[in-house]
Each structure stands twice: as C-alpha cells, then as structure tokens.
A protein has these predicted regions:
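Alpha/beta-hydrolase superfamily serine-hydrolase fold, recognizing
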Residues: 5-7, 11, 23-309
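An N-terminal boundary/leader segment
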Residues: 1-2
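Disordered regulatory segments flanking catalytic cores
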Residues: 18-19
Length: 309
C-alpha cells in the first residue's frame, strides 16, 4: 500500500473521529431501553456494531434497521449517525444496528460490503435470541454507506433465512466507473469535490476494473440484475456532484419494477442530512422514517391497537 495513500486515509479518519461528537444527540431526546456495543464474527475480524434497543412493551419480534455510515469507504464512524439511529429506534420501535465496517485501503472492495452482509446474516441466525424478525429487515446508509446498503440489499435477494423489505439510499455514490471530473455541481466549490472522490475510489478499488462490478457501482447493474430488489427511499441534493447518478439509479430501479420514493432537496449539498440546512435535514429524516414505517407495517399495527383501545 503506498505510504502517502495510507497517511492521507489516517488523517481523514482522525478528522472523522474528532467530528463524531457533533452528531451525537442528548440521549434524553430519544430515550431508549439501551445502547449496547456488540462484536459480530466475520471473515474480516469481529465487526463492531452499536445496537439501539427501543423501549417497547411489545411481545412481538422487533423489526431491524441496519445502518451503514458514510465516509468514502475510507473514513467515517458509526457515531456520525448516532442521532439518526436513536430517532429511528425510538420512533419506530425497531432495533437499529449501526455497523462499524472495515475500511479501505487496508480492506478494499468487496470487504466492507461482504462484512456488512455477514452482519445481516448473523442477525438472522440469532433472531430468536435477539427477539427480532428476520423477515422485516431494512438496510440504509449515507454517501458510501448508501452504496453499501443497496449492495447488501442486492446480495440478500432470495435469501432463505431473511428478507430485506426496504432500502434507504441517501446521496449515495453509485457509479465508481465515471471520471469524477465529469460529476458536476452548479457550485464552484461543492462539499464533495472530484479530487476527494478520486482518492476514495483509488483506496476502495484494488483494481480499476472493479469499478464495472455492479456491487461496486450499482448504477451499472442491468435492469434484470435489479429485479426483485426491495422498495427504496432515495434522496439526492441539488448541489451534490453525486446527484445525477442517484437520479439515474432511481430510474433504473423503476425500470426493474422496484417501487422508489425519490426526492431531490433544493438548495442542499452533500451530507446535508448531517450538516444542514436544518429544515431540509428534518424533512429528509422524516421521509426516511416514513419509508421504514411503511415497510415494517407499523401503521397497521398501530391502527389495530387503537381500534382495540
């Protein structure tokens, strides 16, 4: 591994860790039964994951949301999504599993993807012990995490022991084969620039030819390869250089017969759900929450409870 690449990756990770406190909610805002740290076995070593347990009296197995953080496959930590995970666990009564997957360049494609899928399979295997429903699992992520999430959903198609019922794809990188210089924004200096994307891609792909693999570049999957994918909530931002590939992926999913709820947020750039504007971020979080609520069929359960009250 080139020394300069390794050093730059470590600097980005150090910055990401310093930033994690910015995204952690006061626990009192969304009270939960517990947040626990688990280590899940995988071929790449134990995968650290934060489990957000809802404070629910339901005797029914819990639905599960598997969250994959962003960071260009190179940096980022699950704590960046802490506020989001607390909100979903509290508001939906689901178990949220926030995964600290292995990072490039030490662990290039497909390690992070395959480890995330291994976590999903472990959850299904441990469903009875954990008290979860392996037939009501959703996956999602932001930026690079959105890429991994839709890849995990693809790998899970037709699985015998689990079912992914929804995918959240939030301003995701979906085409690693396209020259980053061709990914344009109307801003002179968008938050995510071509140079940084090029660096992330060089770390994640040990061979540039891997960029053509649909599991690395979901947009390059054929329509037939996307048939049977779960419904999606897909979010893009007006000024984000990844906007066009997100919109193209939404259209390709629709051509494959997949139900897609899509929204482009005007006046926003990459990572706006975490950095603001706050009004747009709140609308995006609510859109994602609503997508999961419908997928988990919580509205029907709530309606039934009200009818019996």
């Amino acid at each position: 591994m080139p020394l300069l690449k390794s050093l730059k990756a470590k600097l980005l990770r150090a910055f990401a860790k310093r930033m994690k406190g910015k995204f952690v909610y006061d626990a009192a805002q969304y009270p939960l039964r517990a947040v626990t740290e688990e280590f899940i076995p995988s071929a790449w070593g134990p995968a650290r994951a934060l489990f957000y347990w809802p404070n629910t009296e339901s005797a029914q197995p819990l639905p599960v949301y598997l969250n994959l953080h962003g960071g260009g496959f190179v940096a980022g930590v699950p704590e960046h999504d802490d506020s989001y995970c607390r909100r979903l666990a509290h508001n939906l009564g689901c178990l949220v599993v926030n995964v600290d997957y292995v990072l490039a360049p030490e662990h290039p494609f497909p390690a992070g993807l395959r480890q995330s899928f291994a976590v999903l399979e472990w959850l299904a295997e441990q469903a009875a012990t954990l008290g979860i429903d392996p037939q009501r699992i959703a996956v999602g992520g932001h930026s690079a995490g959105g890429n991994l999430a839709t890849g995990v959903a693809n790998l899970a198609r037709g699985h015998q022991r689990l079912r992914v019922v929804h995918q959240l794809i939030d301003y995701a990188v979906l085409d690693l084969a396209q020259d980053p210089a061709l990914k344009l924004s109307s801003l002179d200096k968008p938050l995510l620039g071509a140079g940084l994307v090029r660096f992330f891609n060089s770390c994640y792909l040990s061979d540039p030819a891997q960029a053509r693999d649909p599991l690395a570049s979901p947009l390059l999957a054929t329509v037939d390869e996307l048939r049977g994918m779960p419904p999606a909530t897909l979010i893009t931002a007006e000024y984000d250089i990844l906007r066009a590939e997100g919109e193209a992926y939404a259209e390709k999913l629709r051509r494959a017969g997949v139900t897609v709820t899509e929204r482009m947020f005007a006046g926003c750039d990459h990572m706006f759900t975490h950095l603001g504007p706050d009004d747009s971020a709140e609308q995006a979080w609510q859109l994602m929450e609503d997508g999961l609520r419908g997928a988990f069929q919580l509205e029907a359960v709530a309606s039934g409870a009200e009818a019996l009250a």
